[in-house]
Amino acid sequence: MPFRKTIYKGLIVLSFLSCVISCSVEKNTSLTRNYHNLTAHYNVYFNGYESYKRGIDKAQTTVMMDYHQILPVFLYEDEAVHSAVNSDMKRAIDKATKVITYHSITAKPKVKEGNQSPKDKAFYEQNEFNKWVDDSYMLMGRAYMYQGEFFLAAETFKHILVTFPKEDIRFLGMIWLARAYIM
């Protein structure tokens, strides 16, 4: 029995220390990047995206198509959709905000000595080191669109274009920004 208690206490102390070491976004090490990528994706972003998908499903069931009138191109054009999906989209926005607030790593890592490959140079020139922050901004902008907050959505998509100019998500941001301007 005393041996088991010692093992359990050791595991508790070890898990506590690993959480304390990993939880800081002030340091940019491989361990912190992997920890925050993992927790941001599989905890917060996943739940926000699931809430967003639930809202989309509600929007599709809410809209009644009148085939004698001009049909809407996008679901978020209908005022009834805004109130129907408000709670799900608010939760998606809250989750995306949590990813950005608690898991964003903007601190630069220590630069290795010696010659660097172009891939290494591109890595050190990044402004954001968490892979899910740009996706969270995109999720937030889309959720604003379905809430009918087109100005906030446009501002979010503009932020994506300014903050992530070299990422592939900028193209999706441009498309959704154009959609926000149309509304």
What are these regions (language model features)?
Residues 2-12:
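Bacterial N-terminal signal peptides that target proteins for export
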Residues 2-3, 22-183:
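Acidic, polar-rich low-complexity tracts and alpha-helical solenoid repeat scaffolds
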Residues 10-20:
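Bacterial N-terminal signal peptides
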